[in-house]
Amino acid sequence: MTTLAIDFGNTRVKFGLFEGGELETSCSVLAGDAQKLFAELQERVNLHKVVFCATGNSKDFVTFLKKRGLSYEVVDAGTPVPYTNLYKTPETLGLDRKVLMVTAFKEFSGVNTLVIDAGTCVTYDFKNKEDAYLGGAIAPGLQMRFKAMHHFTAKLPNLEASGDPVELIGADTYSAMQSGVINGLIAEIDGLIDRYKLEYDELKIILTGGDGLFLSDRLKNGIFADSNFLLKGLNYLVEFKRT
């Protein structure tokens, strides 16, 4: 059975094709190009199931799916999950965070697991070795930090993260902003990981999201980078509903 998993984020949309439960291929496009890519996939692949999770504004895309006449499943607050959810306000839990924990449960059952999703925001989500989801944290993402400095000041430029090595001490405004955002976020992530390690033994750390690969080589803590962690969770949900 071929399943298409769609992660509709705030700026990008990620597609993953699963065959027999295994991820065959994945790709990511800007939200404005999602309809075109879906139409191309539908022409090339015989889709049996489409599962969809949206954290961004997906109204136009949902309308597009309905016009294509293809049935699909939408993950929402009421979608059942295979783990114990101890979040105090489950109705406000981001759908991306909810799905990420499905993958954590399936792949690391019985293990203390921290999933860090570095996207528009950086989210930290934790499940204990009893497979209970406790919650986590939400912080501004890499690009949001640059945009915030530009938006809330009169003269700071609107920058993007540099792929070059970032010095600790910025010798000009450009490099000072790069250091503040990139080194600051790295220190924040490493610091939170260290605090989790103090409280939970044998901690498995997963890093995913659009900026996950950018950050993975810069962190001092050992992490497992998996850019498809959320797509896997969507496919696991399809399998879970069949059982």
Model-derived regions, located:
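Nucleotide/phosphate-binding catalytic cleft detector across ATP-hydrolyzing
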Residues: 1-8, 12, 16, 22-113, ...
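Catalytic metal- and UDP-sugar-binding loop of GT-A-like glycosyltransferases, i.e.
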Residues: 116
